[in-house]
A protein has these predicted regions:
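N-terminal binding-site loop/beta-alpha segment at the start of enzyme catalytic domains
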Residues: 1-78
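Acidic (Asp/Glu)-rich catalytic clusters
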Residues: 11-12, 45-46, 67-76, 99-108, ...
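Conserved, mostly hydrophobic/aromatic
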Residues: 22, 52, 67, 80, ...
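Active-site mouth loops of central-metabolism enzymes
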Residues: 23-35, 82-92, 116, 121
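Short, acidic/polar
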Residues: 31-44, 90-105, 125-126, 150-154, ...
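A short, structured active-site edge motif that brings together acidic residues
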Residues: 77-89, 112-116, 146, 169-171
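Active-site groove signature of glycoside hydrolases
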Residues: 102-121
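Beta/alpha (TIM)-barrel catalytic core signal, keyed to glycine-rich beta->alpha loops juxtaposed to Asp/Glu
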Residues: 118-234
């Protein structure tokens, strides 16, 4: 694998990103693995996987610090995605969470900032936080993950809600990221996918056969769940 043979995707807004990126779920949980995790991310960058997905939840923020170490001196080459936890997703909380992530990542902006899943705060509050961060240049785009059709339609109905860049779904289970879209939702949403059991044979097969960032089709799809999958949020 090399950078030249990794397919790319144009996000709403025109940004080009690799379809195959690096996730950091479970990173930052053990100091003994830190050097290996940093090295793995660096190797991925060398192979052209310049999209790195992280979150304030991962390792209680330590995964973001590992990303910062791995991309030191290469920030402009990397597309960084991070996420705000739903309990932090008020307008003020979203802004504060982003600022903490920026500090841990040692960067002045996020390329994409996501709401990790629905919580108690109204979407309009989270959206107001995203819009403030966009205005101040702290994020370049925003999105959501683990959203069902009804969630996406509610978001699209808000002023500015149709600017959503992404909603994520699983290649193994729709338990936490259900039906991708509908005819009334945003028309140009990218759907990055994730295996809920990264080390399993099933996950390997699924990710090999399904596109990493399937496009919205504009029609409603039925929920489905692979047997034995719990719908784990990542």
């Amino acid at each position: 694998m090399s950078a030249s043979n990794i397919p790319t995707l144009k996000l709403p807004g025109g940004k080009i990103v690799p379809r195959l990126g690096q996730g950091t779920w479970r990173m930052g949980e053990s100091a003994r693995r830190r050097a290996e995790e940093v090295a793995a991310l660096k190797l991925g960058l060398e192979l052209g996987m310049t999209l790195i997905d992280t979150a304030e939840m991962y390792g209680d923020g330590e995964a973001e610090r590992i990303v910062a170490e791995a991309i030191e001196g290469r920030r402009d080459e990397v597309f960084i995605v991070s996420k705000v936890l739903p309990q932090n997703a008020s307008r003020a909380g979203t802004i504060a969470a982003c600022e903490r992530s920026l500090k841990r990542l040692n960067t002045d902006r996020l390329d994409l900032y996501l709401l990790h899943w629905r919580g108690r705060y109204p979407l309009k509050e989270t959206l107001a936080g995203f819009q403030a961060l966009l205005r101040d240049g702290l994020i370049k785009a925003w999105g959501v993950i683990n959203f069902d059709v009804d969630d996406m339609e509610e978001l699209a109905a808000l002023p500015g809600g149709d600017a959503v860049a992404t909603n994520r779904c699983s290649t193994i289970s729709r338990g936490g990221a259900s039906r991708p879209t509908s005819s009334r939702g945003p028309a140009r949403v990218a759907f990055p996918s994730w295996p809920i059991r990264p080390s399993s044979r099933a996950a390997s097969c699924a990710t090999a056969r399904l596109p990493a960032w399937p496009r919205a089709t504009g029609r409603r799809r039925r929920k489905w769940r692979s047997p034995g999958c719990s719908g784990t949020r990542t």
